[in-house]
Amino acid sequence: MTGKELNKIVAAILFASLIAMIVRFVANILYKPNLQVLNRGYSIAIQESSVNTNATVIVQEPVNIPEVMKTANANHGREIVKKCLMCHSLDKDGPNKLGPHLWNIVGRSKASITDYKYSFAISKLGGVWDDENLFAFLHKPSSYAPGTKMSFAGISKPQDIADVILFLKNYVHDK
């Protein structure tokens, strides 16, 4: 056997080994998928704190919406509504962004914009967006409509909510 023939035999063995490794690698990918569960999102580390036994409990009294609405300020509401414009439009028949447009929302039926896909939580509500419903929704959307896709945490101050509602009522007449 000459050196040339020996080289051919060794090359054939190496080539066959390489092909076998490639076939094994591809077969593992196709028939043994990675079943590892991915952790989605992110975690927030929360420190445990000791419970203060001397803490006072703050009881939130019900808000008299008609009284708060009497002192509402539409100009202040205009400033607060700027937060809403990231996801909503105020224009008449304006485009739906992440949320539906807010033109003429006060007095409008809930989930009534036909070209917007509402979450199941909002679409099953029924009724109209009057002062009381808007007040409750703007205070804490996730409590008013559990399962809503609106990620806004809410407006904590009753006067700010009243200002926003008055602005939305008046905005229809401004345009």
Swiss-Prot record:
It is found in: Cell membrane. Binds 1 heme c group covalently per subunit. Residues 30-175 are periplasmic. It is a single-pass type II membrane protein. PROSITE patterns: CYTC. Heme c binds at C84, C87, H88, M150. GO terms for cellular component: plasma membrane. SUPFAM superfamilies: Cytochrome c (SSF46626). The chain crosses the membrane at residues 9-29. Disulfide bonds: none annotated. InterPro entries: Cyt_c-like_dom (IPR009056), Cyt_c-like_dom_sf (IPR036909), Cyt_c_1A/1B (IPR002327). One of its GO terms (molecular function) is metal ion binding. Keywords: Cell membrane, Electron transport, Heme, Iron, Membrane, Metal-binding, Signal-anchor, Transmembrane, Transmembrane helix, Transport. It comes from the Bacteria. Residues 1-8 are cytoplasmic. May be involved in electron transfer from bc1 complex to aa3. Belongs to the cytochrome c family. This is Cytochrome c homolog.
